[in-house]
Amino acid sequence: MPKYLFWLLWRAWFYILVTTLIVLLLPLLFLLTAHRQWYRALYWVMRHLWATPILYGMGFLPKIRREYKVANDHNSYMLVANHCSMMDIMLMFYCSENPFVFVGKKELAALPLFGYFYRRVAILVDRKSPQSRKQVYSQAKERIADKLSICIFPEGGVPDDESIVLDSFKDGAFRIAIECQIPIVPMVFYDAKKRFPFRCFAGSMGVMRVDV
């Protein structure tokens, strides 16, 4: 029973932490989402003042092994990683100094508060609509022209079956990278599913290993 109570309180703390940080950052978020050219400043805020405090505040210690450093060098990259936890978003921010734009499912735009800013800065895709997928290509090219990187989880979502370690990849990320002639930077999140799965009564604090 104490273990289940811990998991319940720990999950509640996650949502409190995410929401509290957004509320505290509201003035900056409203300001920096007002103009597209301010995205780099917004990215710094999200990386250092939102994602990093969430990771450490939840008791996670990211350990990154780098074969390739994604530096803030005004070059564009296609960042791809396995998708297995809500923590993947925070981990991706933590791993990349280079500002990127997420390509993500439109359903997240319906979330209170978070969804408002998500709509303003991310490239939204309706996975059931071929027209929406075409629009993703054009929007991604615009952001690459702005010298920003693109981040896509090529599995297209988190598999419902938790026994699946890596689901089949959609080809969108690779098509965009080839067409725009930008390097693909693969990342592997080893521990996110174990540390913070989508199931409520599971997970643990500890190291989160990442290969870049």
Identify the function of each model-found stretch.
Residues 1-33, 69-72:
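Membrane-interfacial terminal anchoring regions of lipid-handling membrane enzymes
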Residues 83-85, 155-159:
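Short glycine-rich anion-binding loops that position phosphate/pyrophosphate groups of nucleotides
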Residues 76-78, 149-153:
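Residue-level preference for the first positions of well-ordered beta-strands
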Residues 64, 79, 102, 210-212:
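Generic preference for hydrophobic
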